[in-house]
Swiss-Prot record:
Organism the protein comes from: Acanthamoeba polyphaga mimivirus
Stated name of the protein: Putative ankyrin repeat protein L284
ANK repeat coordinates: 201-230, 253-284, 286-314
Position of the signal peptide: none
Keywords of this entry: ANK repeat, Repeat
Lineage start: Viruses, Varidnaviria, Bamfordvirae, Nucleocytoviricota, Megaviricetes
Length: 354
């Protein structure tokens, strides 16, 4: 098995390993637990069984930098004593299997729709709890601390002190997220606003909506919740990182200046080029790109006729100020990028022959 290929793991609701909770991030079995039960079972997409009990699919990876990693391979799967749980998907939706098809799963013999229906069938009467738990898990961030699992330790003495919500609280919060998301999607702003304010779940709701690309819910949310510029910046960056095109296209129309600035800060050359073509001021873009040391964005402006020598001189002054600040105030005084940009700006002046 090529470990460079994407691996997946099937989990149940709640996500556990022999009654011990799993969590997003690194999970490690004690030696005794690994020897007793054989470890985490991982698959490449092409080897995921057609019918296999579970409720969720996790994208996973192996912590290959750890010397205590153990992996046993077989033809169809591998077993390991530790695993990093990544993004979570519902097995009851055909979209999950369409995604797996892109990773090599053959869905010709059993269609994505039929696979989804089978998993929905095994979910049984707890489908609401399963979907609620899924929504909660999508908002969980990976902890820096590993989750140590000892299946025989009822006192959890081997576990680091991590604050875990108990199962009832998890499901309660998941139900709140489900209710709010549904209310926002249907335009019921009043109910959503009351629940968000009462339960302090704005960040979770934003994360969930952006990851799912739910534009209608997002539009309703920002109409009832006042967002600061910092929050808008984070939302734009998050929509970039999750490649949610419809979300960041809406943000462009709603917050054009913040959208432009965030695109420059994040080095999204393709988006910045498009915004300049649509009419964004290339001089403003040049100076912000100089401030953020975005070489490619500056290079793409090198032949823009609206930029003159004075604009380039100002950009060079901005870069020199950045170099000064890095050398005198930064713990990592590396100014190679800035020196490259100064050289680029000098070359643009020569090329343009002002």
């Amino acid at each position: 098995m090529e470990f460079s290929n994407q691996l997946f793991m099937i989990t149940g609701c709640p996500e556990q390993y022999h009654h011990k909770s799993l969590k997003t991030g690194l999970n490690i079995l004690t030696k005794k637990s690994f020897d007793k039960y054989g470890g985490f079972i991982l698959f490449e997409a092409k080897n995921i069984p057609p019918y296999y009990f579970g409720h969720y699919l996790r994208m996973v990876s192996l912590p290959s930098d750890r010397p205590d990693l153990i992996v046993y391979e077989s033809k169809q799967s591998c077993r390991s004593n530790m695993v990093i749980l990544g993004e979570i998907f519902l097995l009851s939706t055909q979209h999950t299997f369409i995604m797996l098809n892109d990773f090599g799963l053959d869905i010709k013999s059993i269609s994505a729709q039929d696979r989804g229906k089978w998993y929905e069938c095994i979910a049984g009467s707890n489908s609401d709890a399963i979907k609620g738990h899924f929504l909660f898990q999508k908002t969980c961030k990976a902890s820096d601390e590993p989750n140590i699992i000892d299946v025989d330790d009822s006192n959890k003495k081997y576990k680091p002190e991590i604050n875990h919500l108990d199962e009832s609280n998890i499901l309660k919060r998941a139900e709140l997220l489900t209710t709010v998301t549904q209310s926002l999607s249907t335009g019921d702003a009043k109910m959503a606003g009351v629940i968000i304010n009462k339960n302090d779940i704005l960040d979770d709701i934003l994360t969930l909506i952006i990851k799912s690309g739910n534009v209608s819910a997002f539009k309703t949310l920002i109409n009832i919740i006042g967002l600061s510029n910092d929050q808008i910046f984070k939302i734009i960056e998050s929509s970039f990182s999750h490649n949610q095109t419809k979300i960041y296209e809406f943000l462009e129309s709603r917050y054009p200046q913040l959208y432009l600035e965030s695109s420059i800060i994040n080095g999204r050359t393709d988006i910045v080029d498009n915004l300049v073509k649509k009419g964004s001021n290339p001089i403003v873009v040049l100076h912000k790109a100089a401030e953020c040391a975005q070489f490619d964005i500056i290079w793409n402006l090198s032949e823009n006729s609206l930029i003159n020598q004075n604009d380039i001189d100002i950009a060079m002054t901005i870069v020199k100020q950045r170099i000064h600040d890095i050398l005198f105030y930064s713990d990592n005084p590396d100014v190679e990028k800035e020196q490259d940009i100064l050289e680029l700006l000098e070359n643009i002046k020569l090329m343009r022959d002002f």
